[in-house]
A protein has these predicted regions:
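Strongly charged
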Residues: 2-33, 37, 44-156
């Protein structure tokens, strides 16, 4: 076992417009090939579209969508005595955010539509209402954890 201490967690700086670390992390997830300004333009356009469509604060809709898509449980493969069990484990907040944001972005990519801004807008609106592909993925994950609840004592 390593005797070195764990490195300090690097918290990304908050974004300049909403002063939110979550927004900054989400923009970094949207970013492709290092084009951060494009990712920021996509995200802020999406938030403006949401605000125009719903007459609500776009950032609140975004936060609600993330909350609805964040899983509380997931399964992890654990090998015991020659057989592999799917062991349900709790999801830590950072991992939950990472899963939810990647599911929302993947669902938006697979959606039909003209531009990515439009696709992401529709996916965030669906996720904030509790439906959409990202929320379905969360429900599938919870269903899998519930089905394998018998193996919870193998937790590590």
């Amino acid at each position: 076992m390593s005797r070195r201490s764990k490195p300090e967690r690097r918290i990304p700086s908050a974004d300049p417009i909403y002063n939110s670390v979550d927004v900054s992390k989400f923009i970094n997830r949207v970013m492709r090939r290092g084009k951060k300004s494009l990712a920021e333009r996509i995200f802020y356009s999406t938030i403006n579209n949401i605000a125009e469509r719903t007459n609500e604060n776009g950032l609140e809709v975004f936060q609600k969508a993330l909350t609805n898509a964040t899983p509380l449980l997931e399964v992890k493969a654990r090998r015991i005595g020659g057989s592999t069990y799917q062991v349900p484990i709790d999801v830590k907040p950072d991992r939950g955010f990472a899963l939810a944001s990647s599911w929302i972005i993947a669902a938006a990519k697979n959606r039909g539509g003209k531009s990515f801004v439009e696709k992401l807008t529709n996916e965030l609106l669906d996720a904030s209402n509790g439906n959409g592909a990202a929320c379905k993925k969360r429900e599938d994950t919870h269903r899998m954890a519930e089905a394998n609840k018998a193996f919870a004592h193998y937790r590590y």
